[in-house]
Structures are given as structure tokens and as C-alpha cells.
């Protein structure tokens, strides 16, 4: 069961806090129940799944310690209602935790199958991973990931063999090793049932649910403006999305996705943003870039659009300097 409540926030000290208090519903839920109760989707503009071996190890060890005490708080999950699909909600913050939990359920289901507990395995799959749409004769995932992760995750859920190597598969292999050790024989299968129950009712999260993307990013920025370990790209995305307003959010999302997709590494994207800023204003340190961008951009939707128009235009020239054969150069008349 979800325990729903309207939290009474601290007295608002600024516009962001007022918007959070007026437009955010906060619900107490549990990580496993979240996958059971909702249809979730990671937007295409979010970063791909990136948890590595150390993250998974820490997650597993935290779970095992918490099972002894009976409860575990995993922080805040920020969701936004999806204007294009009212049956699902978009994951704005918490993607890594939710995806890892889903992968763990895949590992639990598969281990139960290994041990011959097919009914229990089917129960885990139908509750946490996918629904079967009888009329359409297909399964629908309870969690949809971004384009870089969706294929591998779907193959895991649907038990296909040709899964490409990547972070999703690596995390599955590691978690499967852990659950294999947790239930080494058929006599130990109840350890997996107990773990499933703990994920459903012992791993607590605080849900912040916003009516739309721009409101969700205001919530996310407010929750994370006191020391969270976010990159400059993360902070800038949050700033732009929270400032876009309902009329500009689709444009901001589209441009951000186009520009960000041209860089394989977040550090390279930030380097471009820094060079673009310095081309107009002079030198700025990496540490001071985000605050400088805030002052440069402004807070209105019109200012956000103007900034992104300039960024997209600068990107063409920036990439051309790195690619001598770029078609950009052929468009410049020779003297």
C-alpha cells in the first residue's frame, strides 16, 4: 500500500520553493511496489543507465544490512505526468535506482526458474516486470528505458539470449551472482521470496510527483541545490527545463536531446558548453561555469529559447573544427 500525504514544506524562501509547495504531491512508497503499481518511462533526454560494479556492490550490501533492521530509505524519486500518455509517468530523478531494482527482479525471477519454482518466478515477472496484453498478444514492460538501454533491458525481461554487452547486462550478471549465492539450492528459494517482499515493503522511497516536466525539474533542482553530486550538464539541464514553462518545454527537450546526443562523454559536452560561453564572455573556470551560465541565460522561457538557439548554432561550427571534412566548410564561400 502507498501511504499518501501532502507534506508541509519549510516556509518557502523563493520562487522554486513556492512552486514545489503548490504543485508537488509527495507520497511515501516502496521501491518494489513502485514497479508493481505504476507504468514508468525514462525520457529519451535522460542519461543512459550508468551504474558500475561498485555501485551495484554497494546497493546489494546496503540491502543485506537493511534486511536485518527491517527497513531501508533510498531517497527521493521525482516523477512527472506524461502529457502524451496518461497511463504512465516519466522518471526525472531516480532512474539508476529504479532500473537497478528492476534488473534485480529479473535476476530473482531467473534464479527461481533455475530452482524449478516456475510459479513463483512467473509471479515476480507479472508483478514487477511486464504485463501481458491478451488482445494484442504482446507483453508491455512496466518500466521503459531510454533508447540506449531499452533493447538490452527488454531482452533481459523477455529472456532472449543475444543481449549486447553494456551496463544493463553487466549489472544483471553481477546481481544474478548475488542472488545465486543467496539461494544456492532449491531448499533456499524462500530467501528469494523474502528479498522480493523486502523490496516491496521494506525499501522506502519518497515520491515527488509533478503535473508536468517543467514542474518536475523545479522540484528536482530544489531538492538537489544543497550539495548533490551533479555534473554541470545535469545542473544546466535542470535549470533549463525548470525555466522553460509549459509552452517551451517540448522545444527545450528536443534541442537538449539533439545537442547532448552529439557527445559520447558528459565531460566533452561540458567542455563545449564552456567554450561556447567563453567565445562570448571570456574565460570562466570549470568550477564557475554553472553559475556563470545561470547569470547569462536568465530565467524566462524566452531567454532559455534564445540561449539554446545560440548553443545549437555554435555546435555546428564547434564540431566542424573537429571534423575537417565536415559539410560546413563547403558552405563557406572562398575568397
Question: Where on the chain are the PLM-derived regions?
Answer:
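Short, solvent-exposed secondary-structure capping/transition elements
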Residues: 110-118, 231-232, 286
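Extended charged low-complexity segments that act as oligomerization/scaffolding linkers
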Residues: 122-156
Amino acid at each position: 500500500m502507498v501511504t499518501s500525504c501532502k507534506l508541509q514544506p519549510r516556509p518557502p524562501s523563493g520562487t522554486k520553493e513556492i512552486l514545489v509547495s503548490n504543485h508537488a504531491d509527495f507520497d511515501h512508497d516502496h521501491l518494489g511496489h513502485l514497479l508493481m503499481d505504476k507504468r514508468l518511462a525514462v525520457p529519451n533526454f535522460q542519461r543512459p543507465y550508468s551504474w558500475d560494479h561498485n555501485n551495484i556492490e554497494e546497493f546489494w550490501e546496503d540491502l543485506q544490512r537493511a534486511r536485518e533492521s527491517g527497513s531501508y530509505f533510498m531517497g527521493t524519486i521525482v516523477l512527472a505526468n506524461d502529457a502524451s500518455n496518461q497511463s504512465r509517468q516519466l522518471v526525472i530523478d531516480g532512474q539508476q535506482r529504479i532500473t537497478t531494482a528492476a534488473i534485480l527482479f529479473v535476476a530473482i525471477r531467473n534464479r527461481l526458474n533455475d530452482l524449478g519454482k516456475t510459479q513463483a518466478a512467473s509471479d515476480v515477472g507479472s508483478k514487477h516486470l511486464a504485463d501481458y496484453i491478451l488482445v494484442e498478444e504482446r507483453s508491455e514492460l512496466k518500466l521503459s528505458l531510454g533508447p540506449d538501454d531499452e533493447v538490452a533491458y527488454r531482452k533481459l525481461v523477455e529472456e532472449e539470449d543475444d543481449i549486447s554487452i553494456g551496463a544493463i547486462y553487466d549489472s544483471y550478471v553481477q546481481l544474478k551472482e548475488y542472488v545465486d549465492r543467496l539461494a544456492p539450492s532449491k531448499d533456499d528459494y524462500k530467501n528469494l521470496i523474502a528479498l522480493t517482499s523486502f523490496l516491496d515493503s521494506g525499501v522506502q522511497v519518497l515520491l515527488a510527483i509533478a503535473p508536468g516536466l517543467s514542474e518536475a525539474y523545479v522540484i528536482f533542482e530544489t531538492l538537489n541545490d544543497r550539495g548533490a553530486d551533479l555534473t554541470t550538464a545535469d545542473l544546466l539541464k535542470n535549470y533549463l527545463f525548470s525555466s522553460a514553462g509549459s509552452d517551451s518545454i517540448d522545444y527545450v527537450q528536443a534541442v537538449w536531446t539533439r545537442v547532448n546526443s552529439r557527445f559520447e562523454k558528459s565531460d566533452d559536452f561540458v567542455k563545449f558548453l564552456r567554450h561556447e560561453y567563453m567565445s562570448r564572455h571570456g574565460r570562466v573556470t570549470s568550477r564557475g561555469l554553472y553559475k556563470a551560465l545561470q547569470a547569462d541565460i536568465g530565467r524566462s522561457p524566452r531567454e532559455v529559447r534564445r540561449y539554446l538557439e545560440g548553443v545549437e548554432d555554435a555546435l555546428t561550427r564547434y564540431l566542424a573544427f573537429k571534423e575537417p571534412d565536415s559539410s560546413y566548410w563547403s558552405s563557406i564561400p572562398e575568397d
